[in-house]
């Protein structure tokens, strides 16, 4: 709703990352005309759809800010080990994390491809170093504050009739 802030963790971008890496689109229940496209055409279409959707949001007064948190392979390993070794963090870890780690370099290539294909002036990407959490949080806060400062955030003005109705209450 207007005046609200929403945060999407991964969102529709998951559909062009994991799905593309593992060819999961082949199992989609979609019209043959869609599934018969070769893989490059299929995902080029997805990128175009994302750009158009974000353009639509922008043109309807929504602000889209996309942040990619880049964690190095060494830092990822360190965080995984912390999650395994620390019982308070066990819930954050899944064996599937290790399986996906084998694709680290492939994911980096796809992240770059997706960011390049979907970045726009109206819906920019911010690729941030994320090995040092304090610094990443600082950068994210700066981006969010800047976005909020450049957003119209005036309260709606009630019509004279609506104001009178309030007085009558």
Task: Cite the ranges covered by each PLM segment.
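Conserved nucleotide-sensing/catalytic segment adjacent to the nucleotide-binding pocket
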Residues: 1-42
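Phosphate-binding beta-loop-alpha motif at adenosine-nucleotide cofactor sites
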Residues: 62-75, 95-99, 120-136
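NTP-dependent small-molecule kinase module
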Residues: 103, 107-169
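Switch/connector loops and helix/strand junctions flanking conserved nucleotide-binding motifs
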Residues: 14-19, 73-80, 135-138
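Substrate-engagement module of ASCE P-loop NTPases
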Residues: 31-61, 95, 99-106, 110-114
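Domain-level detector of nuclease and nuclease-like folds
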Residues: 64, 72-75, 79-90, 109
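Short secondary-structure boundary/capping segments
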Residues: 21-25, 81-86, 142-145
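Conserved catalytic network of the ASCE P-loop NTPase/AAA+ motor domain
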Residues: 1, 56-62, 118-120
């Amino acid at each position: 709703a207007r005046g609200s802030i929403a945060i999407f963790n991964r969102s529709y971008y998951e559909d062009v990352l994991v799905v593309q890496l593992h060819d999961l689109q082949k199992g989609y229940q979609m019209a043959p005309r869609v599934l018969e496209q070769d893989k490059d055409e299929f995902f080029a279409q997805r990128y175009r759809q994302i750009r158009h959707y974000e353009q639509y949001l922008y043109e309807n007064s929504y602000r889209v800010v996309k942040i990619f948190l880049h964690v190095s392979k060494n830092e990822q390993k360190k965080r995984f080990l912390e999650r395994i070794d620390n019982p308070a963090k066990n819930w954050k870890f899944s064996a599937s994390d290790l399986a996906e780690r084998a694709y680290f370099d492939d994911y980096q290539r796809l992240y770059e491809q997706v960011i390049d294909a979907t970045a726009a002036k109206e819906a920019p990407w911010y690729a941030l170093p994320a090995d040092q959490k304090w610094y990443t949080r600082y950068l994210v806060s700066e981006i969010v504050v800047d976005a909020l400062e450049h957003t119209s955030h005036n309260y709606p003005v009630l019509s004279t009739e609506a104001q009178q109705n309030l007085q009558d209450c």
